[in-house]
């Protein structure tokens, strides 16, 4: 018998950071000439929406979108290696934290959010990727 506080471990709960979301696209890209001078955008639905709104702009500027709707910074941090580092971009633009504030994956403190964002920045810099941080948009609970 399942306890009341146990979650169903169905397929949607086994990939909490959503590593599979871009897995097939990442395999195709790998380390190719197409990645040369590429900039990856890492974030949540706001980021994901940018390339949906203006796909030509992303394509002509060699921008790659790795935003996932509803994502929080702990999920983004786990995805950072396969969705950014392993693609060998010259730069990454990181926008995250809005869904942390909203509590999408549980309560978060400002320190938790900034630690996750700074960890992504450190990983990027250690891998010779220029890092650009976007500020969290104003939110109200």
Predicted regions and their residues:
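N-terminal secretory targeting modules
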Residues: 1-41, 47-48, 52, 56-57, ...
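Short, basic, glycine/proline-bearing loop/turn elements
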Residues: 13, 63-68
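Conserved beta-strand elements of the Class I
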Residues: 40-42, 64, 92
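Short hydrophobic segments within beta-strands
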Residues: 42-43, 134
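Catalytic nucleophile serine of serine hydrolases
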Residues: 45, 69
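Alpha-helical cap/lid subdomain in secreted, periplasmic
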Residues: 56-62, 71, 78-141
């Amino acid at each position: 018998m399942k306890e009341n506080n146990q979650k169903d471990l169905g397929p949607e709960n086994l990939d909490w950071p959503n590593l599979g979301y871009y897995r097939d696209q990442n395999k195709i890209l790998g380390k190719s000439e197409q990645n040369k001078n590429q900039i990856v955008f890492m974030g949540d639905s706001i980021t994901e929406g940018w390339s949906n709104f203006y796909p030509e702009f992303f394509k002509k500027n060699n921008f790659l979108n790795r935003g996932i709707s509803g994502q929080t910074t702990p999920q983004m941090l786990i995805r950072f290696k396969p969705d950014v580092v392993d693609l060998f971009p010259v730069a990454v633009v990181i926008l995250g934290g809005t869904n942390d504030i909203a509590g999408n994956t549980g309560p978060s403190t400002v320190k938790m959010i900034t630690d996750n964002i700074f960890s992504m920045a450190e990983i990027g810099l250690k891998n010779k990727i220029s890092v650009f941080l976007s500020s969290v948009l104003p939110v109200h609970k």
